[in-house]
Amino acid sequence: MDVVARLASQRAVVIFSKSTCCMSHAIKRLFYEQGVSPAIVEIDQDMYGKDIEWALARLGCSPTVPAVFVGGKFVGTANTVMTLHLNGSLKILLKEAGALWL
């Protein structure tokens, strides 16, 4: 989990993704459309991808991707992120983490 914690704390928003996952693509688009430039970790293309996926599973990510971290804290996977977006809470989290300026 150390590698996940280290990567998650490097930027205001970090998305652990797989390049072939349609839900990962949708979540990345959501953040881009909000004006956020997240760090993207494509675990299927990372040499430590299996270790990262295992660590995400231990955090409770099911499925393991997309896994979204805001301000270094695990926010959730696609369902949770979409719920936060729809109820307006995601924008608040992004502002608090310094990922949004407006």
Curated annotation (Swiss-Prot):
Gene3D superfamilies to which the protein is assigned, alphabetical: Glutaredoxin
Give the UniProt subcellular location, in the record's own words. Answer: Cytoplasm; Nucleus
InterPro entries according to UniProt: GlrX-like_pln_2 (IPR011905), Glutaredoxin (IPR002109), Thioredoxin-like_sf (IPR036249)
Key words, A-Z: 2Fe-2S, Cytoplasm, Iron, Iron-sulfur, Metal-binding, Nucleus, Redox-active center
Domain annotation Glutaredoxin: ranges: 1-101
According to the record, the segments passing through the membrane are none
One term under GO cellular component = cytoplasm
Q: Which residues form a coiled coil?
A: none
> GO: which molecular function terms?
2 iron, 2 sulfur cluster binding; metal ion binding
CDD domains the record matches: GRX_GRXh_1_2_like
What is this protein's function per UniProt?
A: May only reduce GSH-thiol disulfides, but not protein disulfides.
What family does the Swiss-Prot or TrEMBL record give for this protein?
Answer: Belongs to the glutaredoxin family. CC-type subfamily.
The protein's name = Monothiol glutaredoxin-S10
Q: Which organism is it from?
A: Arabidopsis thaliana (Mouse-ear cress)
